[in-house]
Amino acid sequence: GQTGYRDNSMVIVSPDKQYVWDFYQTDVDGKKAKAIKKWDLSSDGIAQPWPSPYDITNPKVGNCRVTPVPLLSGLVTYAEVKAGHIEHALHFAYGGIEGGQPLGMNSSVYPCNTSNSGIYDNQWSPWLGHRFQLDPTLDINDTSTTGPWGGALSAGEKIIAKALQEYGMIYVENSGPRDLSIYIENVEFDATRSWS
């Protein structure tokens, strides 16, 4: 990865769409990573608990995020937004796992039933695996500055808001302090696609 702490995550999907490989702290040229995890897309997408402690330094074992779910699951893709709908829960990272008691099996819920014991839990943080839902009664078309959005949502924001109302979002990863991030496909290196 880059100097300093970065996830530098990467996902590769097999041409037959049967397998996906997650990469953690991938070098910019994509030739090296600190961890690699292969997932079978015909399974439930949830890793089994490890018989030994999580070891991020071993590229043959471990997950590429704090929780045992693939990077692809919960990802907002370019194709979904262009199609105008997202038909699954989103995954998000939050800066709530910092200080306090050691993170243990009792501070996560399914599907995040195992987690990295090297990170610490903030007493005010939700448990990994908790699902949050945007109030389905909120009007995503409200354009008033006094409404719930403080103005009009863009077309893409409406698609994400609708998915949050219908499916919610699941807490799967730690992020920086006071930071909340929804996972969205990076199209930076594809000149044919743009989020703008």
Where are these regions (language model features)?
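A surface/extracellular/periplasmic glyco- and lipid-processing/surface-interacting theme
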Residues: 2-165, 169-176, 187-188
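Extracellular low-complexity, O-glycosylation-prone Ser/Thr/Pro/Gly-rich "stalks"
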Residues: 181-196
